[in-house]
Regions:
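Aromatic- and carboxylate-enriched substrate-binding clefts and catalytic-loop regions
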Residues: 369-559
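Bacterial Sec-dependent N-terminal signal peptides
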Residues: 1-22
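Carbohydrate-binding surface patches
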Residues: 611-653, 696-699
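An acidic-aromatic substrate-binding cleft motif
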Residues: 259-352, 360, 364
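Catalytic cores of secreted or luminal carbohydrate-active enzymes
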Residues: 561-608
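N-terminal accessory beta-strand-rich subdomains and adjacent acidic, glycine-rich linkers
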Residues: 22-295
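C-terminal beta-strand-rich structural cap/linker in extracellular carbohydrate-active enzymes
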Residues: 677-704
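Catalytic domains of carbohydrate-active enzymes, especially glycoside hydrolases
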Residues: 349-370, 437-441
Length: 704
């Protein structure tokens, strides 16, 4: 690893006439200008290639209990400049090594009236800006409560935005594409039902927010290293096109309880004239602390199947019985009730999944609905809902563990909390120890429904601290965590790579809840995945959900070839083949791609991209010279031209191409696909047609 600092300058200012500082990126393409206004209000501007992309925007924080907030009346008392350049190795990721190169400007500001000091630290990379607030230890600012963070992001015009409604509890919305000026009138139609939701403004949107200016500049706003702070949303003034940060409140309406010394999360702006650069940016990861886990040998990417989709579609149930309307854990005797015959997490059925996983080379099997409590788990705001260790009578924990071990298959635990965070924390050590005792080294946790204690939100400070506690506690037991319904990620997986996955967006399950837009996965890599990988659970081959459950008329709004492409487009070290084994058995030739595609990558190339319309990505296997290409296409059929110049010169490869058939269409003919093979080199160019809602996948094997 390279790791060096240069040009370290500290200057004390009397600051008369010296209230503006500038910072350039290492390659000189970006320039940030900081200034204090006449009343001492901090501001910043951002330029790319001499073009303003963020207009002068105010910085500051409003305090809840103090007469004077940290908004103005500042003077500059210290300036420190650094340059930092390193290349760090990933435990897992889209590449094995990431370059972290930035110029830094740390400005100490002192408030005249209160003599309080804050530091605003800027880091300017070759692809964008990160900045945060820092609160040094001082007698005039120790314990304080945030009423609101007043960070602004002033846009230069009425950009096109790809947004979801600002919500304290969920990100599980379809994206809306509109001008900024149109958000207000479209907001109510963009809000769809969810198990728990709370909007705050009809111009409020969530990050990661993706935009495109009229002159073709792509801009992404997000945050990094969200720890012990509230999740940031953005509230738009649609008269001025200025976004202001909007933090998630707690049950009392406060936005954060802080104790100096402390820091805010980083606010990030990624920008480029090429959409592919947004996908390639590693600013979010680079702004997080290095890995804190000394031995990471137990953290391993996983390809898995699971007893899950059949419950999501309504074909099977999580609950063991229909005879118990009210479960009292430790009192209700499930051995004395009649099973409902739809309970999927039974020993015989789970062993069938284990057999399928072993036959086709998967690593693990997830089982949901194995533990007592599912009869009244949802909508009751029940605290003691699960104990995470007591199985239903038809689920033999030891027998399943022994059987899976004999087949070389790992089991993935499921901990649904029903939002009862205190109950989960009370049982966490016992639950994690139960996992270790029974051979589970990964857990999928869930937070469906309103958060308990009541009044808190999924994205408020104390609940974010709960998620972090579960991640760090899991390290003690060498357990990998895949958190669903938790806050969207902000790069913390660099620091704690046992956080191997999150959902935290509208995943595949919504295809069985009425469907998602056909261009959904052309937007997720530009938005949700900017913060970290997503357990999207692709691989659905049967698009007509009524064939699984006659009472569910949902339709999966993609083609089968698109589902294959998602294993490359939707990066995750945790990849599920989500459909039922019997559906894969009908399409074993297409299923071969899912079997072949790795979950560990050496490098990634972004071949073509336009948010909302198409994405094509090539990735090289970490453990071989093989490459894999995936495409996801939006509503309009198109032709992709694939340049194979990413392949090594002088070598020959065989490409197996899984593409939409000529008559494929996500609505009318989603299972129409074709498979072909051809020899390719780094000089090859290939044109592939994609259907509406379609895509393609290519496996490229070196010919030796």
């Amino acid at each position: 690893m390279k790791n060096y600092f240069v040009s370290v300058i500290a200057v004390l200012f009397s600051i008369f006439g010296m209230n503006a500082q500038d910072l350039q990126s290492p390659n000189g393409n970006f320039k940030m200008i900081f200034a204090l206004e006449n009343d001492g209000t901090p501001t910043y501007q951002l330029f790319m290639n001499n073009k303003e992309i963020i207009k002068k925007s105010k910085l500051g924080l409003e305090l809840q209990k103090d007469k004077k907030s940290l908004l103005n009346d500042f003077k500059l008392v210290n300036e420190v400049r650094n340059t930092f350049d390193e290349t760090w190795k990933t435990v897992w990721g889209e590449e094995t090594a990431i370059k972290n190169h930035y110029n830094e400007l740390a400005l100490t500001l002192k408030q005249n009236e209160t003599e309080r000091q804050i530091i605003i630290r800027f880091r300017l990379f070759n692809d964008g800006l990160g900045f945060r607030y820092e609160f040094p230890e001082q007698k005039n600012l120790t314990y304080f409560v945030l009423k609101e963070e007043r960070t602004e992001f002033a846009m230069t015009g009425d950009h096109t935005a790809f947004w979801i409604p600002g919500d304290y509890d969920t990100q599980e919305y379809d994206f809306t594409e509109s001008k900024l000026s149109e958000i207000r009138k479209l907001f109510s139609s963009a809000v769809t039902g969810n198990a728990s939701q709370k909007q705050f403004s009809d111009t409020g949107v969530q990050t990661s927010l993706m935009m495109k200016s009229a002159d073709g500049i792509y801009i992404n706003i997000h945050e990094a290293a969200l720890i012990n702070y509230s999740c940031m949303h953005l509230n738009l003034d649609d008269a001025t096109f200025i976004f202001q940060s909007h933090l998630t409140p707690d049950a009392k309406g406060n936005k954060g309880h802080l104790q100096a010394p402390c820091v805010s999360p980083w606010r990030t702006i990624i920008a480029s004239s090429d959409a592919r650069d947004i996908l390639a940016s590693r600013i979010t990861l680079n702004l997080n602390e290095p890995c804190k886990i000394e031995d990471t040998s137990w953290i391993k990417p996983v390809k898995y199947i699971g007893v899950w989709w059949e419950m999501i579609t309504g074909k099977s149930s999580w609950a063991y019985t229909d005879e118990v309307p009210s479960v009292q854990l430790g009192v209700t005797d499930f051995t004395k009730v009649k099973p409902n015959k739809t309970h999927a997490a039974n020993t015989k059925h789970v062993k069938e999944y284990i057999d399928f996983a072993a036959k086709h080379g998967f690593d693990a099997v997830l089982v949901e609905g194995w533990n007592e409590g599912w009869e009244d788990w949802f909508g009751k705001e029940k605290d003691y809902v699960f104990d995470f260790v007591t199985p239903y009578p038809d689920f033999d924990v030891k027998g399943i563990h022994d059987y899976a071990k004999s087949k070389g298959i790992k089991m993935i635990m499921h901990h649904e909390t029903s939002g009862a965070t205190r109950n989960y924390e009370r049982h966490l050590d016992k639950a994690y120890q139960f996992m270790k005792d029974n051979g589970y080294d990964a857990v999928k946790s869930g937070y469906v429904g309103n958060i308990l204690p009541l009044g808190e939100y999924h994205y408020s400070q104390s609940i974010l601290n709960h998620y972090q506690y579960c991640i760090e506690k899991a390290v003690d037991y060498k357990i990998m965590v895949n958190a669903h319904e938790a806050v969207r990620p902000t790069g913390i997986c660099r620091t704690f790579p046992n956080l191997i996955g999150n959902e935290s967006a509208r995943g595949t399950e919504f295809q069985a809840f009425g469907g998602s837009k056909a261009n959904h996965t052309t937007l997720l890599p530009f938005t949700r995945l900017i913060g970290g990988p997503m357990d999207y659970t692709p691989g659905i081959f049967e698009m007509d959900i009524a064939k699984l459950n006659p009472n569910n008329n949902s339709h999966v709004n993609t083609t089968l070839a698109n589902q294959l492409g998602l294993y490359v487009v939707m990066y995750s070290p945790l990849q599920m083949a989500a459909d039922l084994p019997e559906h894969y058995n009908r399409f074993l030739d297409a299923f071969q791609f899912i079997k072949d595609v790795p979950v560990e990558w050496a490098t990634s190339k972004y071949l073509e991209a336009e948010p909302g319309y198409y994405i094509t990505i090539a990735r090289k296997d970490k453990n071989s010279n093989n490459w894999f290409v995936g495409n996801s296409n939006g509503y309009k059929a198109r032709t992709s031209t694939i340049n194979f110049n990413f392949l090594e010169k002088g070598k020959k490869y065989e490409a197996t191409i899984y593409a939409d058939a000529e008559n494929a269409d996500y609505k009318t003919n989603p299972q129409a696909y074709k498979i072909s093979k051809q020899k390719v080199t780094n000089n090859t160019k290939l044109q592939l047609k994609t259907a509406a809602g379609g895509g393609f996948a290519i496996s490229i094997v070196e010919i030796k």
